[in-house]
Each structure stands twice: as structure tokens, then as C-alpha cells.
Curated annotation (Swiss-Prot):
Keywords noted in UniProt: Mitochondrion, Ribonucleoprotein, Ribosomal protein, Transit peptide
An example Gene Ontology molecular-function term: structural constituent of ribosome
Name of the featured protein: Large ribosomal subunit protein bL33m
Species classification: Eukaryota, Metazoa, Chordata, Craniata, Vertebrata
Membership in a protein family: Belongs to the bacterial ribosomal protein bL33 family.
Length: 65
């Protein structure tokens, strides 16, 4: 029995890497991974420039994981 080469469509990954930017206006950012199906990410995280926990909001998708 011979196996034929069949091309399959590449499946999408379940997680993506996104860039989160500080809302304190310092320009500090970091990368975080989230589920593809989830809504845009916003969370409290430490900003070392202002030495406080501030709100970080998802700015853009970087890549699929």
C-alpha cells in the first residue's frame, strides 16, 4: 500500500503573543501570551519607571505560538 502526499491546511495556533503597554504614559511595555479566542487583554502589572502597579492594555499581536 502506497501513501500519497496530501496537503492539509495548517491549523491555527491556540495562543498568541501580544504586546502590553503601560497606561501611565511611560512607554514601558512587555509581552504576554493569551488565548486566541479571548478578548483583548488588560491587566494590572508593575511599571518600574513609576514604581507602581498600573494598567497595561494590549496594543498589538506579535506572533502566533
Amino acid at each position: 500500500m502506497l501513501l500519497s502526499a496530501v496537503s492539509f491546511a495548517k491549523s491555527k495556533s491556540k495562543t498568541i503573543l501580544v504586546k502590553l503597554v503601560s497606561q501611565a504614559g511611560t512607554g514601558f511595555s512587555f509581552n504576554h501570551k493569551r488565548s486566541r479566542l479571548r478578548e483583548k487583554l488588560s491587566l494590572l502589572h508593575y511599571d518600574p519607571i513609576v514604581n507602581k502597579k498600573v494598567l497595561f492594555v494590549e496594543q498589538k499581536k506579535i506572533r502566533s505560538l
